[in-house]
Amino acid sequence: MDLDHILSSLIYLSACFAVFVAGHMVFVLFRRSYSIKAELVEKDNTAFALVLCGYYLGLTFAIGGVIAGPSLGLEDDLIDMLIYGSLAIILLNLSALINDRFILSEFNIKKEILQDKNCGTGVVEFAIFVATGLNIYGALYGQGGSIFTAIVFWLIGQAVLVFIGKYYNLITHYNIHDHI
């Protein structure tokens, strides 16, 4: 392995880290009333820890979708990472809003996570972020696609996720929201 490969690997790693930091900042921006330090350190809020870990894991999968596949060269890859990484962050946070509205519609998510420290809600949010991250990975992975195709596949994935969430509640003999 020569110096050129090491430097390009460090550049790719730095770009991934920059996208991850940007994703964290957007997470904080979307949840201004949340204090990450207070919830994790002072209040020892396991439900919030689950939500945050799910977001980070989903974001990691989404970033993986951006960098997976054949390289087009360092410059083109970095441009793709900027464009599709930003798109992945936006889609992941939009997914949280969509899923909170349609899958966990009977909950006040903020109250369940921050006040009640409901780990059941935290696990569902964790799973939604991971599923959405994998969805974004699949939407962004591969060759020949465009932003439009990525958004279409993401929309299809979100529709399936919401449908399955609603359908599951219909086929069970109890209201899933009561048991979370």
Q: Locations of the language-model features?
A:
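Transmembrane helix-loop junctions in multi-pass membrane proteins
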Residues: 2, 32-34, 61-76, 103, ...
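Membrane-interface helix-loop junction between the first two transmembrane segments
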Residues: 21-43, 172-173
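A generic, lipid-embedded transmembrane alpha helix
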Residues: 46-67, 126-133
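Transmembrane alpha-helical segments of multi-pass membrane transport proteins and ion-pumping complexes
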Residues: 13-25, 29, 65, 88-101, ...
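Membrane-interface helix-loop-helix junctions at boundaries between adjacent transmembrane segments
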Residues: 78-83, 99-124, 143-149
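Membrane-interface segments at loop-to-transmembrane junctions
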Residues: 37-51, 109-124, 176-180
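Alpha-helical transmembrane segments
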Residues: 4-19, 76-93, 144-162
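Helix-coil boundary and N-terminal low-complexity module in membrane systems
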Residues: 2-15, 33, 45-47, 58, ...
